[in-house]
């Protein structure tokens, strides 16, 4: 499911005030981190992630890998922070 530009705008605004709930360190994506990410994104749908890697291209690759593995989508990235969205069909939340 591709996010439309109008939907992305709404999600970006909603994600602005969020605090990062997951921090990815130098070790990258471990099984335990992926498990925690799955639980968190199922519950919240829209989450902010902080990535503690200084290299910009490595951060981008890590975010893409995370989204591919979890079937989620990047809403926005600013520096070392990314906002990620995945719709939970069981959730009652309405973003748009």
Predicted feature residues:
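Positively charged, polar, low-complexity stretches
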Residues: 1-96
């Amino acid at each position: 499911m591709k996010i439309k530009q109008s939907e992305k705008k709404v999600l970006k605004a909603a994600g602005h005030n969020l605090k990062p709930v997951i921090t990815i360190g130098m070790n990258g994506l471990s099984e335990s981190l992926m498990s925690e990410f799955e639980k968190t994104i199922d519950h919240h749908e829209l989450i902010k992630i902080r990535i503690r890697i200084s290299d910009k291209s490595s951060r981008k690759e890590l975010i893409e890998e995370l989204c591919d593995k979890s079937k989620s989508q990047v809403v926005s990235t600013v520096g070392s922070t990314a906002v990620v969205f995945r719709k939970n069909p069981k959730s009652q939340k309405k973003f748009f």
